[in-house]
Swiss-Prot record:
<feature type="domain" description="VOC">
    <location>
        <begin position="1"/>
        <end position="119"/>
    </location>
</feature>
<dbReference type="Pfam" id="PF00903">
    <property type="entry name" value="Glyoxalase"/>
</dbReference>
<keyword id="KW-0046">Antibiotic resistance</keyword>
<comment type="function">
    <text>Binding protein with a strong affinity to the bleomycin family of antibiotics. Binds to CL990; an antimitotic-antibiotic compound.</text>
</comment>
<dbReference type="InterPro" id="IPR004360">
    <property type="entry name" value="Glyas_Fos-R_dOase_dom"/>
</dbReference>
<dbReference type="InterPro" id="IPR037523">
    <property type="entry name" value="VOC"/>
</dbReference>
<dbReference type="InterPro" id="IPR029068">
    <property type="entry name" value="Glyas_Bleomycin-R_OHBP_Dase"/>
</dbReference>
<dbReference type="GO" id="GO:0046677">
    <property type="term" value="P:response to antibiotic"/>
</dbReference>
<comment type="similarity">
    <text>Belongs to the bleomycin resistance protein family.</text>
</comment>
<keyword id="KW-0814">Transposable element</keyword>
<protein>
    <recommendedName>
        <fullName>Bleomycin resistance protein</fullName>
    </recommendedName>
</protein>
<dbReference type="InterPro" id="IPR000335">
    <property type="entry name" value="Bleomycin-R"/>
</dbReference>
Amino acid sequence: MTDQATPNLPSRDFDSTAAFYERLGFGIVFRDAGWMILQRGDLMLEFFAHPGLDPLASWFSCCLRLDDLAEFYRQCKSVGIQETSSGYPRIHAPELQEWGGTMAALVDPDGTLLRLIQNELLAGIS
């Protein structure tokens, strides 16, 4: 197994969190009363129980580096995630950033911000 780091994100309700991410191709790898791990290909997200979380006040976030950001964005839209400036869940379209990369954003039902970054910028870095 390769060494890796995974984000630890809050979930108000594991059933709801799993249902949301399963629509985006993630599957449950592990789950008990206080912890859940979801995986989609090489992407892994870990969730801890946080039933009292206020999604509007959440400051949790992480970055997902994707080989095909445009396809993941299309998948989010195809399952009904709205492109809007407020509320949750929501998606923000991919845009070229000043730093040279392409980035979109997904806010999940618990108010967690997932920055979606196209991998191309890191292709030449080893």
